[in-house]
């Protein structure tokens, strides 16, 4: 990103408009055929620093460029404490960068108000947290419908359909204490999709699941991806990497392969091809009684 913008460019950015110079920056990074609005979500030159109690600030994200296309599954890997959760929080508009730009589709959200960011997050982003919470007094279908932006009737129908997709069609009226750990995680993932987000952010989505259920969840992510949703998952699970279209590495706040075209396409194809070759039957189905 250019460090010396004209006054007009600065005013355009403050108003949430991408300037020609900014678009040119994107087009010359990683993929010359892509402009801002070709991405579902993007970061440009993002820095995130945290105070360290009087010493030098901790740099969690160091001049990060990242983008995901609609219908792309990106896995983010790296050591613990390397900034992966911070990356998800900044992408998901849960935390603000110290500097840099953020875009959702063709909208520059860098200078939006708190209320505008909250609305954009609710309308465009779904979250699958590692430590999710279901309200104990609500049924599965009520938990899924809770964050909806739709009218209540449509929300209930959509919530029921999502739970059926996740193999929980016979658990609609069960409360969380009547569900296994894996079933509760599937309820949480279904809830993340209730508003038909353009972007799905997942923190260790298979971390608490057995291999079969994890594969079933990832197969559902592929179905979501086929519907045009960009899926971005922080993970330590090699299985998630096998399903991803692209794997990027974040170490000490430095992101490698963050833009389409920066990773090795042959390595990506080999990784996914090896997974597909190892299958002798269709992916596992999520049964209602599986944990």
Question: What does each model-identified segment do?
Answer:
Residues 100-108:
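Conserved ABC transporter NBD signature motif
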Residues 107-108, 154-170:
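Conserved ABC ATPase "signature" region
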Residues 109-125, 226:
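ABC ATPase NBD coupling module
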Residues 138-145:
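Short coil-to-helix segment of the ABC ATPase nucleotide-binding domain corresponding to the Q-loop/switch region
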Residues 168, 172, 192-193:
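ABC ATPase C-loop
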Residues 174-177, 194-195, 227:
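Conserved signature/switch motifs of ABC ATPase nucleotide-binding domains
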Residues 175-185:
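Conserved ABC ATPase signature
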Residues 200-203:
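Catalytic Walker B motif of ABC-type/P-loop ATPase nucleotide-binding domains
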